[in-house]
Amino acid sequence: MTRPRAAPGTVAWKSTWSKHPIDRDGRRTPDPPVEARGRAAQGRTFDWLKPGSGGSRRGGPSFASGNGAALLRRPILRILLVSDLHYTLPQFDWVVHVAPSFDLVVLAGDNLDISSAVPLDVQSVVVLHYLELLKAAGKVVVCSGNHDLTGPDAQGEQSALWLAEARVAGVPTDGDAVVLGDTRVTICPWWDGPLGRQALDQRLEREAALRPARWIWAYHWPPLGSPTCWTGRRDYGDADLRGWITHHQPEIVLTGHVHESPFKPTGSWADRIGRTWVFNAGRQIGPVPAHVQIDLAAGQAAWHSLMGQEMLQLADAQAPQRSVF
């Protein structure tokens, strides 16, 4: 299946974010060179430590090579999944407001909107500010979707170049991994060509060798053959992700992209493929985005939307029958 592409005529992203990191002399840190952007700048592991256990004073992320198994980490208990906010600022406001109630907030792609009258470089500046707010409010990771692509990376394939600034600011993004307690979160980019696909395939193999008790992926497009990719007319999923799930069997994959799936009687916000739970909250109008709350301690996941709420047990062998229709 052909992957959705960036908008025709997309220009290379130019940084205008006013909150660049400042060096010790008070000077604005320059943009990374082109060769340091995209996949070349990826691959960090964020070990989020307990305050006072050797991390930052605020308990924020510290960078480490490998999986840092000797470090004491705080476990993930509650996860908030949202995706496809598409530059809907009231929905970003809501996410910032509720973020302190969660151990991890996952923005699973399509943060920008290529159909908006607001230029992508302006949108990216605003969304980067929201990521800074989310970082201050709690722990956040963000992966790219097809709407987030702003120009070619060092390999000449389309990439969300602007997200490199999120990483510099301490927000894990495309190509990074986060370790909290017994959980590893792998953040997957929206790949736009064979080199990107190959890089992700190789990375998942490397990450599998570091796999702890629980492995979670953030990946924008749901897998092919799943009700989480049903549009109401066709199965619109990612065949490559389906293969990777079958091969690696992560515990949870957090997706988006197909807005309609949870709102169709034969679609869903949740699916189980082997031992893997796949979630897609979908997209809705209004100031509160459709979202999925996952409580790992309670072993539950719940979908919240204008249509109502549905819940499942993570120990279930399959997703339950839909109840909002």
Enumerate the predicted regions with their spans:
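Short Gly/Ser/Thr- and charged-rich N-terminal loops/segments
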Residues: 37-38, 42, 50, 65
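Active-site-proximal beta-strand elements of phosphoester/diester hydrolases
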Residues: 78-86, 182-191, 216-220, 276-283, ...
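Active-site neighborhood of phospho(di)ester-bond hydrolases with catalytic His/Asp-centered motifs
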Residues: 81-83, 105-110, 141-146, 172-173, ...
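Active-site environment of divalent metal-dependent phosphoester hydrolases
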Residues: 86-91, 112-116, 143-154, 193-195, ...
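Core catalytic region of metal-dependent phosphoesterases/phosphodiesterases
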Residues: 87-179
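Proline-aspartate-enriched helix->loop->beta-strand connector
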Residues: 102, 241-245, 249-255
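Conserved catalytic scaffold of divalent metal-dependent phosphoesterases
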Residues: 148-240
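Binuclear metal-dependent phosphoesterase catalytic core
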Residues: 178-181, 242-247, 261-325
